[in-house]
Structure formats: structure tokens, C-alpha cells
């Protein structure tokens, strides 16, 4: 065990690091709130134009991943309720579930998780990597020239969630 002075230095360094992490989280939360407000203003203050999700997104697109192949798996517990990055993954043989790649957006389809905001924007995979997750996810992928992050902000929009909960 280090002497008391060394322990105090370690505690001080640890506190500095955790304070920085908390500050960066607040900055990220503020940036996401700003982006969401901009998104809302841009897309929900316009004339009402009806369209389906299939008109603007690829919904549950096919992604190549054979059964038994080792791949990263993102369980429901890894989807955040705020922020966009999943909190972890495991590697295991693929035996079913939705498949996705970088640029795809995931949203939970089951009511409690949808209400709680379980969603993620996937941007942490290696190039060309296909991952998989719960059959209770809906995957949105970019269609035409729509930026892939559009779908993340769409699913984080309270009007969209309220609409989705009706089904």
C-alpha cells in the first residue's frame, strides 16, 4: 500500500479525471440537445408532407452475416437512453437477430424500451464489419442522399416516438 501522500495524489488525479469525464458528458449532452433543436426546427416546422419510413429510409436492410460466424453483438442493455453510442458489446457466434453496419441507426421496438429512449447510432465498428443484436431492434439505414445521422435525430424526436408508440 502506498504511503498516505501517494494515496492523496492518486485520489486527486482520479477526481480530476472523473470531473473531466462529467464535463465532457455535459458538453456532449448540450451538443446533442442543440442538434436535436436544430433538427426539430428544420424538419418539423415545415409544411406537413406525408411519407412513410420506407420512402426515406431502408428499414431492416439485409446485411451479410452467416450463422455461426463470430461477430460483435449489442444486446438491448447496451443501447443508451441518452447519447448515441452503445455502452458495450460481446463477441459470439451469430445465430439470429438484426444485422447492422456503421452508419445504421437502431431503435428498440418493444414499448418500455422505446418509451425509455433505447436507441443508438452505430459508428464504432471496423470498416466492413457487420454486427448483430436483438430481434427487438429496428434498423434504419440511409436511403438516397439522406445523411445517415438524420435517422438518429429522427428517432430521438419526441413526436416520432409518440407516433411510433401507437403501433
Where are these regions (language model features)?
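Sequence-specific dsDNA recognition surfaces
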Residues: 54-108, 113-128, 133
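Anionic group-transfer/hydrolysis microenvironments
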Residues: 34, 77, 110-111, 138, ...
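Basic, amphipathic alpha-helical recognition segments used for DNA target recognition
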Residues: 1-8, 53-64, 129-167
Amino acid at each position: 500500500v502506498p504511503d498516505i501522500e501517494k494515496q492523496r495524489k492518486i485520489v486527486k488525479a482520479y477526481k480530476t479525471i472523473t470531473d473531466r469525464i462529467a464535463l465532457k458528458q455535459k458538453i456532449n449532452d448540450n451538443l446533442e440537445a442543440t442538434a436535436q433543436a436544430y433538427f426539430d426546427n428544420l424538419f418539423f416546422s415545415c409544411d406537413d408532407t406525408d411519407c412513410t419510413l420506407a420512402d426515406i429510409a431502408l428499414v431492416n436492410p439485409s446485411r451479410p452475416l452467416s450463422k455461426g460466424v463470430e461477430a460483435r453483438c449489442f444486446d438491448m442493455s447496451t443501447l443508451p437512453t441518452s447519447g448515441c453510442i452503445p455502452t458495450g458489446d460481446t463477441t459470439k457466434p451469430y445465430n439470429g437477430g438484426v444485422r447492422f453496419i456503421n452508419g445504421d441507426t437502431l431503435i428498440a421496438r418493444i414499448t418500455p424500451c422505446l418509451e425509455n429512449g433505447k436507441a443508438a447510432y452505430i459508428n464504432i465498428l471496423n470498416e466492413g464489419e457487420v454486427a448483430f443484436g436483438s430481434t427487438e431492434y429496428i434498423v434504419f439505414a440511409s436511403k438516397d442522399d439522406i445523411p445517415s445521422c438524420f435517422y438518429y435525430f429522427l428517432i430521438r424526436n419526441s413526436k416520432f416516438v409518440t407516433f411510433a408508440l401507437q403501433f
